[in-house]
Amino acid sequence: LMFDDMRTGWLSEAGGEYVLTFLKLAPESLPAFDQVHVGENLTLLGRNWQVTNIEDAECIAGQGELPFKVGAGYKAPVVDLREGDHFATLDYSESPPLLFVGAPVKFESLAMTNLRDLTAGGAIPDINVEAQVFRCPSCGSPLSARSADIKSVGCESCGAVVDTSDRNYQLLSAALNPEEERYTPHIAIGSKGNLEGKPVEVIGFMVKRQLCDGVAYDWREYLLAGEQGTYRWLTEYDGHWNVADVLSKHPHGSRKILNEFKYGGETFKHFSTYQGRVLQVVGEFTWRVACNDVAELVDYIAPPLMLSRERTESEISWSLCRYVAP
């Protein structure tokens, strides 16, 4: 982006979150990319940042006026950091790494004009937006991905999960065995409605499992596409439903599991820590998900609210969940 005072900045979008950052002078001593780990803390520009995402990314295309040459095959290893309302990225595509600092922003606050038109509700791109239509490489069933935001698609017919960021459509996980339990969504993929007064569409369905003392507890998660590229979640366990939103501002940056802490004027107390494993994937998702993916989850409660931290080898995310009547 170029501003009226000729400053330039970068607006990024991932999973419905928009972040505006500006290039800053980086300290001379920065860790190497392969020495950085999710969850650790780094002190930069007087702030104690937490590493929340690590991606060994690759640029696949570029358009418009850019300060450097881009194109397919351009390697861009990046590390994302958060501290309260602040956001930073270390870009290891150059040596020394580039440092970009800024904050998440609401899309409407950008007051953008001349944007691509969306259909009513904003959940589905119009006919001018290129959609991918292909066949499941496992069973041959027809599949589709509505936009470039979609990184993986789960086949409802056989249970395989396909990488849609690769036009070769490689499998992220194979088809489920016939004897494996399959869940039917309570809310069908493609269902449309209003959630808290805003239009949404169900585009993805996922089943996860926790094992506790040898007993399996399965829960279901529905990915909802909303207006202007936003996403929300509905989760269900044993008939109990929650609306969940991924947070831009993380409640705390501690690697430890706290007994309690304050967030949004509420005191949240530790409820449980467990491993969640993906059992089933159906529909479209904005990241590469696969069956048998495992994450550590830590839940804190202040009924009817719950804060949930999910941690994998490459990412930490927080979600605020609110109990709703079925």
Residue spans for each PLM region:
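A composition-biased, non-transmembrane "mature-region" signal
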Residues: 1-326
